[in-house]
UniProtKB/Swiss-Prot annotation:
Subcellular location: Cell membrane
Main location: membrane
Similarity field: Belongs to the UPF0344 family.
UniProt keyword annotation of ATP-binding present: no
Protein name per the record: UPF0344 protein SAR0931
C-alpha cells in the first residue's frame, strides 16, 4: 500500500503542475486541461484513500507517533484542497500565484513529514521504525 501511495502522490504532483500550466491567462483552459484535471482528481482521490489506509494500519499496529501521523494526514488533505483552489482561481482568471506557491510549500512540508515517519526512509535507514 505504501508504494501505491507514493506513486499516486508523485503522479498527482506532476499532474497538478501540468494542469496548472495548461490554463492560459487570456483564453482559459487548453484542450488538454479537462482530461488532465480529471486524471489529477483521480490520483488525488487515490492518494487520500491509500494515505488513510496507511494511517489506519499505523494506528492498529501501535508504537507509531500518532501526533505526526495525524499532522501529516491534515497536511495531505490541505494539499488536495489547495490544489483544487489554485486551479479554480487560475481558471477564473484571478490572482493564483500565491496560492500555487503556498501549495508547493505545503507539499514539501507534507513530504518531509512522510520521510521522518516510521514508514519513511529515514526511519528505515536508522532502524527507528
Amino acid at each position: 500500500m505504501l508504494h501505491l501511495h507514493i506513486l499516486s502522490w508523485v503522479l498527482a504532483i506532476i499532474l497538478f503542475i501540468a494542469t496548472y500550466l495548461n490554463i492560459s491567462k487570456n483564453q482559459g483552459g487548453t484542450p488538454y486541461f479537462k482530461p488532465l484535471h480529471m486524471v489529477l482528481r483521480l490520483f488525488m482521490l487515490l492518494t487520500l484513500i491509500s494515505g488513510f489506509w496507511i494511517l489506519i494500519q499505523s494506528f492498529m499496529n501501535g508504537g507509531a507517533n500518532h501526533m505526526l501521523l495525524t499532522l501529516k494526514m491534515l497536511c495531505g488533505v490541505a494539499v488536495v484542497g489547495l490544489m483544487e483552489v489554485s486551479i479554480a482561481k487560475r481558471k477564473r482568471h484571478e490572482q493564483s500565484h500565491t496560492m500555487f506557491w503556498i501549495t508547493i510549500a505545503l507539499i514539501i512540508i507534507t513530504m518531509v513529514l512522510g520521510v521522518i515517519l516510521p514508514l519513511g526512509p529515514i526511519s528505515k535507514l536508522f532502524g527507528i521504525g
